[in-house]
């Protein structure tokens, strides 16, 4: 009895010591994972576990997203997971997504896994039409997506229809034109073929470099009202805060870069923005829900922090990551070059093999022809020899007949003819015998000449037979494989060798020399756009090519706005924001209040 009680106590003790857990499902852009989490875990514990599992070190761009009553929310790092307003049914589901976007993907995204996750997310946003993308740019982006998935274009492998099951273009773009899937595939493939030699990470980065210049890239939109009650849209992104007309999400009416904002706070549904210049009055707006204000503040804090970080020297961790990325890139470049060399050598060997097979077949044909010529020569020689023998026998026979005729003539001459009639008759016979003898002599001479000619022809035929045998012998003894020229080894590649105080809902931004740094960033953007001149020409060419197939009645409001901007010689997103910030902050605040 005592033993049973002790056993139950021991089991209860073990049960109490065993940590209680709950199941979490994490959904990324291309996978799902499940984890057992302890009840006491905070958001940071779960977030760090996911990042370690993915091998992700650039954690500052990402977050765990969930939905509360149709409103997006993000897991807070310092709050217990189960203290969030999430479903208590297991598994608790979160989406691992990019929360903040870089200003320049090529400069800021270091790890390949980071680039890949951004690529998948931005691609989905474009296909789901959460980011507006013009038709011609959609085709170009699709070609890079195909390069990332399939590698280099190979006509023997990527035959017509190989993209039939792929989702590559927004449905809006497909419905806008009278074009068959085959016509779209043809245009995508034409660009896809030009991307030869780009690895998956390079193709994905080219995709992001184009996508980041789209007007709606990286912008979170929120419905707000100003003091006058005018319905507007607030856009929060990596560059600052932007105010939009609800009917036009492409071009902001006003912009406030992060370097002009000193403090952001909210009370209930009212949001307050304090400009850096204290002489300028604050401006306020109202959102629809308190929960939305919390989200806006989170995005403002995170984007401002990254805005500041970009304009400072890289931390030691980032420097190490960039160094490792450079080494990895150099290693992959060497590997690609090695594979390219091997592929080149293999193709060269295959070409040499094909050439040898072709030459061998040619030599076999030549040998067959030589054999046939030899056989014909032998047959001709046999026929000539036989004909010469017959002619020689005929000549002998004629000579014998001529001798007999001569003897007959002599016999007749020796015979005495007594009567005149017999004499005349004999003279006639003698004359006939002489004519016959003359003809026999001429025929004999002709036959003799013909025999000589046949002997000469026989000699020539035997000479031709000898030459044919000699050529056949040369073909038989000729080397089958010609010497191969060594492939020169390529030269070795160059190897490059806001803080939140307590629980207050306010955030102060520190002053810094932001304008100068912003100008430097803008300068880099301008240089990038200059390099993209050829790309823009290609886009314009495709736009012109498919314009005749457009169904105008199917254009959306954003299509019309984009076309109007283009017709006015619309500039890039960054240039548009720069123009909007040329006015003083005071005048922009006043303009916002009067909207």
UniProtKB/Swiss-Prot annotation:
InterPro entries: Band_41_domain, ERM, ERM_C_dom, ERM_FERM_C, ERM_helical, Ez/rad/moesin-like, FERM/acyl-CoA-bd_prot_sf, FERM_2. Gene3D superfamilies: 1.20.5.450, 1.20.80.10, 6.10.360.10, Phosphatidylinositol 3-kinase Catalytic Subunit, Chain A, domain 1 (3.10.20.90), Pleckstrin-homology domain (PH domain)/Phosphotyrosine-binding domain (PTB) (2.30.29.30). Residues 22-311 form the FERM domain. The modification Phosphoserine is found at residues 13, 518. One of its GO terms (cellular component) is ruffle. It is found in: Cell membrane; Cell projection; Cytoplasm, Cytoskeleton; Nucleus. Transmembrane segments: none annotated. Phosphorylation of Ser-518 inhibits nuclear localization by disrupting the intramolecular association of the FERM domain with the C-terminal tail. One of its GO terms (molecular function) is actin binding. PROSITE patterns: FERM_1 (PS00660), FERM_2 (PS00661), FERM_3 (PS50057). Keywords: Cell membrane, Cell projection, Cytoplasm, Cytoskeleton, Membrane, Nucleus, Phosphoprotein, Tumor suppressor, Ubl conjugation. It holds the Pfam family ERM_C. The keyword Nucleus applies. Interacts with NHERF1, HGS and AGAP2. Interacts with SGSM3. Interacts (via FERM domain) with MPP1. Interacts with LAYN and WWC1. Interacts with the CUL4A-RBX1-DDB1-VprBP/DCAF1 E3 ubiquitin-protein ligase complex. The unphosphorylated form interacts (via FERM domain) with VPRBP/DCAF1. Interacts (via FERM domain) with NOP53; the interaction is direct. Interacts with SCHIP1; the interaction is direct. Probable regulator of the Hippo/SWH (Sav/Wts/Hpo) signaling pathway, a signaling pathway that plays a pivotal role in tumor suppression by restricting proliferation and promoting apoptosis. Along with WWC1 can synergistically induce the phosphorylation of LATS1 and LATS2 and can probably function in the regulation of the Hippo/SWH (Sav/Wts/Hpo) signaling pathway. May act as a membrane stabilizing protein. May inhibit PI3 kinase by binding to AGAP2 and impairing its stimulating activity. This is Merlin. It comes from Papio anubis.
